[in-house]
């Protein structure tokens, strides 16, 4: 994306690490059958699209997974903060999802985050989401370094 420097990307991803973890923390605290059903459906679709190697739909499922967690958190300010940050990093996120090895890791990480939220384990959900976002940051930084 034009206007995003390596320094900007680091800043954005560092902020996302904190806020995404917080979103998952609150989602686990506010867990509902409806929210879990939405996440489970997204995970099932994500696994389906992974098997089909459909990068565009995988990116959409990745977006939806994080959006639903934001909704489940019950804190509008979390969504209001994260949506613009996701938009700013879309190009790098899309390239990252196109990498089969990274996508397999994303699917596993999303499943673990879901399990923690479903169990109501807020601390574990936050830690797993933070770790997931750190991995995304590393992948994006690698893409930026190698492809500009």
Regions found by a protein language model. Give the residues of each.
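HTH-adjacent hinge/linker in prokaryotic transcriptional regulators
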Residues: 1-17
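Charged, amphipathic alpha-helical coiled-coil/dimerization segments
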Residues: 3-7, 108, 127
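Short alpha-helical transmembrane interface motifs in multi-pass membrane proteins
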Residues: 5-6, 92-96
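Conserved amphipathic alpha-helical segments that form helical-bundle/coiled-coil interaction surfaces
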Residues: 12-18, 33-94, 109-114, 124-135
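A eukaryote-biased feature capturing mid-to-C-terminal, repeat/solenoid-rich segments of large proteins
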Residues: 26-34
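Short acidic-aromatic low-complexity motifs
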Residues: 117-120
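Short arginine-rich
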Residues: 134-144
């Amino acid at each position: 994306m034009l206007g995003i420097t390596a320094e900007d990307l680091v800043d954005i991803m560092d902020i996302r690490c904190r806020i995404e973890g917080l979103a998952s923390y609150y989602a686990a605290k506010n867990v509902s059958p409806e929210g879990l059903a939405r996440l489970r459906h997204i995970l099932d679709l994500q696994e389906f699209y992974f098997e089909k190697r459909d990068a565009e739909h995988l990116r959409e499922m990745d977006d939806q997974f994080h959006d639903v967690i934001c909704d489940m958190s019950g804190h509008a300010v979390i969504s209001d903060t994260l949506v613009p940050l996701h938009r700013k990093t879309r190009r790098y996120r899309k390239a990252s999802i196109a990498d089969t090895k990274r996508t397999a890791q994303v699917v596993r990480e999303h499943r673990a985050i879901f399990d923690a939220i479903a169990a109501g384990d807020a601390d574990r959900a936050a830690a797993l989401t933070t770790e997931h976002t750190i991995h995304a940051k590393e992948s994006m930084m690698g893409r930026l370094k190698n492809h500009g």
